[in-house]
């Protein structure tokens, strides 16, 4: 392998904020945030909105989506102003 062209592969702590779950996975993700893990070591830290711990496909449970999409937000605010052509 050529030196200097491959990304830095290291353990990273991912935090699923919707269910407050933490897990360590090997990744090449770059982040400036760090967190001290249960083993006393400091790891890079990254937050997630959805992971296998919270996604309905993996959990088998439906959940209310808290972050509404931009289009749905636009339609909610301005949907009443649509003109109907006759």
Curated annotation (Swiss-Prot):
Gene3D superfamilies from the UniProt entry: Ribosomal protein L31 (4.10.830.30)
Protein name: Large ribosomal subunit protein bL31B
SUPFAM superfamilies: L28p-like
Entries under PANTHER family matching the protein: 50S RIBOSOMAL PROTEIN L31, CHLOROPLASTIC (PTHR33280), LARGE RIBOSOMAL SUBUNIT PROTEIN BL31C (PTHR33280:SF1)
Record keywords, A-Z: Ribonucleoprotein, Ribosomal protein
Organism, as annotated: Vibrio parahaemolyticus serotype O3:K6 (strain RIMD 2210633)
InterPro entries associated with the record: Ribosomal_bL28/bL31-like_sf (IPR034704), Ribosomal_bL31 (IPR002150), Ribosomal_bL31_B (IPR027493), Ribosomal_bL31_sf (IPR042105)
Biological processes, Gene Ontology terms: translation
The keyword NAD belongs to this UniProt entry's keyword annotation: no
HAMAP family assigned to the protein according to its UniProt record, in alphabetical order: Ribosomal_bL31_2 (MF_00502)
